[in-house]
Amino acid sequence: MKHSRALRARNWLLFWTLFIGLGAVAGAAAMLLDPSGKALGMDAMLPYFQVLPFAETVFQDFTFSGWALLLVNGLTNLTAAGLLLRKKPAGVILGGIFGITLMLWICIQFYMFPLNFMSTAYFLFGAVQAATGYAAWVFAKQKAFRVDPKDYKNVGTDPRRLVVYFSRMGYVRKMAYEAADRTGAEIYEIMSTERTAGTLGFWWCGRYGMHRWPMPIVPVVYPLKRKVAVNRRRLFLFGQYSRSHKVPRL
């Protein structure tokens, strides 16, 4: 069975929430079991915490830091992972948000510590998690998007009108059907000979928009000229089409 890119993004987000969440729980447990930090050689880090507010009260050992790590990055990410496993939409949203939370957490470390590999790596992990969450959310929205021609009962009732459109993901198709339904026009979809589907299709088609190149299309088999010229009706056009296949507008 072919997996959608929405499912792949969701699975990657699940990995990141589990990776960050379990790692945070392990780190918090180490801090709470040995607040002095000597067992893992973390006691040398305590002087850096003294630049933070209320350091003389809450940062004399790792007790407060352990609870903060558990609540901010541990339980939150594991909650998002649980929602993702249950296929709840909130899991995608929270997974992305908690990636941003991790980045903010690391920004505090950038303020406290000299530049180091661990903080930089986890900042990048947070950025990737946030980006993955956003991608999973967008892909899920795209996957759920539907245009059912049966919902537009008035399309084709006025053969004097015609709506012509090009749509890569279906959004312009919805606009075209709505316009045709309002006017009773017939409808015709222009198809490209280039790859347009999926993420690769997005980047492939983007070249044409960036360079303003004409995109090659499948030859038009609908008698557009005859219909428009004879009926003298305005042609509604949605999307882009090749300059070599321009349709007359009256």
Q: Can you name each region flagged by the protein language model?
A:
Residues 2-155, 177, 229, 243-250:
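Topology signature of small-to-medium multi-pass alpha-helical membrane proteins
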